[in-house]
Amino acid sequence: MPCHGMMRGIVQPCPGPRGLAVMTFVSRSRRAVLGLAPAALLLAAMPSAQAADAADQTLLNATYDVGRELFSEINPLFVAKWQKEHGGQLKIDQSYGGTSRQAQDIIQGKKADTVTFNQVPDIEILVKRRLVAKDWASQFPNNSSPYYSTIAFMVRKGNPKNIRNWDDLARPDVKLVFPNPKTSGNARYSYLGAWNHAQEQFPNDEAAAKAFMGRFLGNVENFPTGGRGATVAFAQNGQGDVLLTFESEIKSILAGKEFKDQGFELVVPPVSVMAAFPVAIVDKVVDAKGTREVARAYLEFQYSKEIQQLLARHNLRVHDPEVVAATADQFAKVRLVDPATFPGGWEGIQKTHFASGGLLDQLLAAGRH
């Protein structure tokens, strides 16, 4: 590119395909070389130009829509570490967007070496297209999930609608904002959190569970394609009473300067879904580019204590025991339910809820009549 658990350095923004944001991370050493006079640069390059060219690598990581701040910190750290240990030049391009959309772009030819997604099904789509290995989940610890979060609620100052639990989200006086589950992993977890609540409230009454979901979805005021759009709709445009998103995202919003004067508040329901953030190597791409070693090291880096601590600072729940113990007071107590334990696992969830003509489509269609 020229512009380039619990229960059961420079950043250059570039236009990406289909509106996806792409960021480029370049090392300080590379900037230093670029600043050399042409003659000096030529003399320095002459003895080993072929070797230097062979060592230069570019990695493209495709990730979820609200991952900008996190990966803008992770990527320069990894670039510095890799170049110190291996030499040569490494550049990381970063693509952001709803992960379902990202997966489709990879299927259509986007050359992502790695994916750091926020839901398993979008990696499984790549497995079915033989872009990712079938055993991807066993290639890294914790089912290839370096960190996780949960779905929580962001409400307006003083919590005027007294939102406490999933039941409150189905009340007729409450309006919701969260992304479209067809395009966003974030939104699928929000939907599944509501579905889990309905199943626990009405364990033997499918009709009552569906009725609850109908009321819940009927309260959605805005269905953006990704998490960032949902945040803008709620926080900047004033839409809705409740924003459903990752706990980590809400905490980042509350700690940031952009919306601090609005006094938003975090509500963590007593029960919610565990939102794993799975990672994988896109085998077909790394084999073609010769980047498997650096791609694997990049994902392994996210399990290092340094990055586990960084993840916790970004309000993400992690697996490293020492970091977990040190940050225990940072996170609300919540019973987390893993969607993988739902009937049929993620494959069953996809077929039942999110496939064309599935329960989500049925409920949305019913709400329009």
Give the positions of each predicted feature.
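N-terminal export leaders
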Residues: 30-34
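Bacterial N-terminal signal peptides
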Residues: 35-45
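N-terminal segment of the mature folded domain
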Residues: 53-183, 328, 335, 361-368
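Short beta-strand->loop
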Residues: 62-64, 155-156, 175-202, 216-223, ...
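A bilobed periplasmic-binding-protein/Venus flytrap-type ligand-binding module shared by bacterial periplasmic
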Residues: 150-159, 276-293, 310-314
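Short helix-loop capping/hinge motifs at secondary-structure junctions, enriched
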Residues: 158-164, 183, 196-204, 285-293
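Ligand-binding pocket segment of bilobal, Venus flytrap-like solute-binding proteins
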Residues: 201-269
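Extracellular/periplasmic juxtamembrane helices and adjacent flexible linkers that interface
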Residues: 286-369
